[in-house]
Regions:
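Mid-domain Rossmann-like dinucleotide-binding core that forms the NAD(H)/NADP(H) cofactor-binding site
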Residues: 1-56
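Glycine-rich cofactor phosphate-binding loops and adjacent beta1-alpha1 units
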Residues: 1-3, 41, 46-121
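Structural detector of well-ordered beta-strand residues that form the stable sheet scaffold
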Residues: 8, 31, 97-99, 125, ...
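Aromatic/hydrophobic pocket-lining residues that form π-stacking "cages" and hydrophobic walls in ligand
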Residues: 15, 19, 39, 63, ...
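Residues in the short beta-alpha loop(s) of Rossmann-like NAD(P)-binding domains
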Residues: 36, 104, 130
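C-terminal hydrophobic helical "lid"/dimerization subdomain
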Residues: 86-90, 131-183
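E1/E1-like adenylate-forming module used to activate ubiquitin-like modifiers
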Residues: 121, 127-130
């Protein structure tokens, strides 16, 4: 990667926004794409300048405008974001890199047209975790490179776990991040 490279990020969920913040830290230009205006607003509050809502704008055309016609050198796809991967070939430049980030045990079948990937000679990789990067992660958090504001959906007291977890597990999609207060 080089300073100023464009990184398209499909998904403005927690991992997508953190990835965008890391892009800024490493002097890359993130472009976050999501259909959820609330998530895009959160991304903007985290300092992400370029956001695109596919229901309001043509994603490829907007990427062309932002990048001056180059398209994104890198595209990150977060499967839990509920974004479809069909944008990947149209927004990633020829010879670019696509990374599937995060892990979703519900994801059994990711459909991407291999012909489009081969035609553009895209490099496809996967990043499941940050094993071995714990110290770096703590350092980034301690130095406030990563802003966690708005990520925590609920805080429960340790003594209330027995009562609260069944309620939370009834609708696992209603709660993104839950913190247990042990103090």
């Amino acid at each position: 990667t080089e300073r100023g490279d464009y990184v398209a990020i499909l998904g403005a969920n927690t991992l997508g926004i953190i990835a965008a913040e890391l892009c800024i830290y490493y002097q890359l230009v993130p472009i976050v794409i999501d259909v959820d205006e609330t998530k895009l607003s959160l991304a903007e509050n985290h300092g992400i300048y370029y956001t695109i809502n596919p229901s309001k704008a043509d994603v490829r055309q907007r990427i062309i405008e932002i990048t001056g016609g180059k398209l994104a050198e890198f595209t990150l796809y977060e499967p839990r974001s509920n974004m479809l991967p069909n944008y990947i070939p149209s927004i990633t430049q020829e010879g670019g890199t696509v990374a599937v980030i995060g892990y979703n045990y519900f994801l059994s079948n990711l459909q991407l047209n291999l012909g489009d990937v081969l035609e553009k000679q895209l490099n496809v990789t996967a990043v499941k975790n940050g094993y071995g990067e714990f110290n770096t992660a703590i350092n980034l958090l301690a130095n406030k490179v990563i802003n966690t504001e708005g990520f925590i959906d609920s805080v429960i007291k340790f003594d209330d776990i027995g009562r609260e977890l069944p309620r939370i597990s009834e609708d696992k999609y209603a709660y993104g991040k839950v913190v247990v207060d042990c103090m």
